[in-house]
């Protein structure tokens, strides 16, 4: 059983908290401390952002984090090194990489999939890869035991949902809002209806992200989704607490996890 499946199974019907940070923001050492701290405070799955110069799906908070990481010279290989170091002391917590196709394409799909598996990556989500064109990367990830994770939006067609249901591993990431990460408003009734609809086709967990900014919104989403995904709010905490990132993020993650238990 994969680490992601084990993580959901261990919750015994409870809801997972998936916590996102951008690797290298503010630096590699802090990234590792944040990863361990988030797990200690209740994060069930870690989602690591791969810095990219044109993060079109990300709002301003995560865009700034990517800029800071790129200014530090962080590359995809550095991200894999971070996972490798994390695995020296944590062999249980699932780690998912979230980013854009360009850095993966530059490395080569086969090399990337092999190196990701060796480093201890459990899943990969490339936000700008339509399901219709992802087959070359999907095959390499599958051959190396790494889950290919897909986004589903409110506008995703039924045919595309069916295709994703056949290919997806680990969990499916439902984008609760039209727009970019960090967007403000969240209609939990609409999300609930959509999750119920999606589970007619999808038999793996569905996590909901975009627009979850506090314990109350996490609690509401946790009632209807299998996992609550929080990114911009955590990254903003890093941005606003220079020198005290780990403590600030740890406190936030604990608050969020308490809300979704």
Curated annotation (Swiss-Prot):
The pathway entry for this protein reads as: Amino-acid biosynthesis; L-tryptophan biosynthesis; L-tryptophan from chorismate: step 5/5
List GO molecular-function terms, semicolon-separated: tryptophan synthase activity
From the UniProt record, list the reaction(s) this protein catalyses. Answer: (1S,2R)-1-C-(indol-3-yl)glycerol 3-phosphate + L-serine = D-glyceraldehyde 3-phosphate + L-tryptophan + H2O
Give the first-level EC class, as a single word.
lyase
Give the E.C. number(s): 4.2.1.20
- Identify the domain of life: Bacteria
Keyword terms: Amino-acid biosynthesis, Aromatic amino acid biosynthesis, Lyase, Tryptophan biosynthesis
Gene Ontology CC: cytosol
Active site residues of this protein? 47 (proton acceptor), 58 (proton acceptor)
Q: What's an example GO BP annotation here?
A: L-tryptophan biosynthetic process
Asked if the keyword Amino-acid biosynthesis belongs to this entry, the reply reads yes
Recorded hits in Pfam families, A to Z, give:
Trp_syntA (PF00290)
Functional note: The alpha subunit is responsible for the aldol cleavage of indoleglycerol phosphate to indole and glyceraldehyde 3-phosphate.
Q: How does it assemble?
A: Tetramer of two alpha and two beta chains.
Q: Which family does the record assign?
A: Belongs to the TrpA family.
Please state what the protein is called. Answer: Tryptophan synthase alpha chain
Gene source species: Neisseria meningitidis serogroup B (strain ATCC BAA-335 / MC58)
């Amino acid at each position: 059983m994969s680490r992601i499946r084990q993580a959901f199974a261990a919750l015994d019907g409870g809801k997972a908290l998936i916590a996102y940070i951008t690797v290298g923001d503010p630096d590699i050492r802090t990234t590792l401390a944040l990863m361990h701290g988030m797990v200690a405070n209740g994060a069930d799955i870690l989602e690591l952002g791969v810095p990219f110069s044109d993060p079109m799906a990300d709002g301003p908070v995560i865009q700034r984090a990517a800029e800071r990481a790129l200014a530090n010279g962080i590359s995809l290989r550095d991200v894999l090194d971070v996972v490798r170091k994390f695995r020296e002391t944590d062999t249980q917590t699932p780690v998912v990489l979230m980013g854009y196709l360009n850095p993966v394409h530059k490395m080569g799909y086969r090399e990337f999939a092999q190196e990701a598996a060796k480093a201890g990556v459990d899943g990969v989500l490339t936000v700008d890869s339509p399901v219709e064109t992802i087959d070359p990367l999907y095959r390499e990830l599958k051959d190396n035991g790494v889950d290919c994770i897909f986004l589903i939006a409110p506008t995703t067609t039924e045919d595309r949902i069916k295709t994703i249901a056949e290919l997806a591993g680990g969990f499916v990431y439902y984008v609760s809002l039209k727009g970019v990460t960090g967007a403000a408003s969240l209609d939990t009734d609409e999300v609930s209806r959509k999750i119920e609809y999606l589970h007619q086709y999808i038999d793996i967990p569905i996590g909901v992200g975009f627009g979850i900014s506090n314990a109350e919104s996490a609690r509401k989403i946790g009632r209807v989704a299998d996992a609550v995904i929080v990114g911009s709010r955590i990254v903003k905490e890093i941005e606003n607490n220079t020198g005290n990132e780990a403590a600030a993020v740890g406190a936030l993650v604990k608050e969020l996890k308490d809300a979704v238990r």
